[in-house]
């Protein structure tokens, strides 16, 4: 199936189940139920993020951005989860993890509640790659790995797993390099955060104080000095996905404003012009990312 056919099929599904005339229309500001999210994923939503060897599609940056744009057009929760599981789980997982671990995690993504990448912490700076990151792991004498982490997570409060970013600790010395660890649900204690501003997502503080198998470690590089650069690449690439996400959301806002507001009122015309201006800027950024960024190379 070529890109045009794939995107048309996805758009047809979105319109049928989430469009203006659908009885199941999703709210832009309400959390997307897990059964509906799984149904959407079954349409191949995440396959552009997945390498061909695991059943994905030919790498195509425009296709990635179009999927995010389409999802954004039909709801914040949909495009948010698409970006989370695509750019922050599937892409780093399939690039850095061993095949056995990849094959263990992918069914949780495509047939379960999925997961996410846990980076930011409540007890340190909000910067994703801050020197102050407190989460760490230690390789134990028995070969297992001890993980101590406290992370924010936005998605569905508690998913089937988290990919946890942490520093390696050797004795009392905390290393500078960052690696990832696959932590299943049973090792995680979580406390939901309720906020009127977070209706589209479920936010929580997740705490991990557990011993996990050594094979759950995902090294970002065999060379410790390069692991931070690889981690930065994950973070930057995920931020590039925001351009497709927000472009779809802006399109939705523009469509509804033009449809329902009385444009003959002067200040309304001014606001419409402002939205038009922002949509034009968004389109420039969108086209730039589609045409200049590689879907596979470091950014």
Give the residues covered by each predicted segment.
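C-terminal helix-coil-helix/basic helical segment that borders enzyme active sites and/or dimer interfaces
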Residues: 22-28, 258-266, 279-299
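Buried hydrophobic positions in well-ordered alpha/beta secondary-structure cores of metabolic enzymes
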Residues: 44, 67, 98, 117, ...
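A short core secondary-structure module
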Residues: 144, 148-189
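Amphipathic, small/basic residue-rich leader segments at the start of a protein or domain
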Residues: 1-83, 104
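Glycine-rich beta->alpha junctions and the first turn(s) of the following alpha-helix
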Residues: 192-280
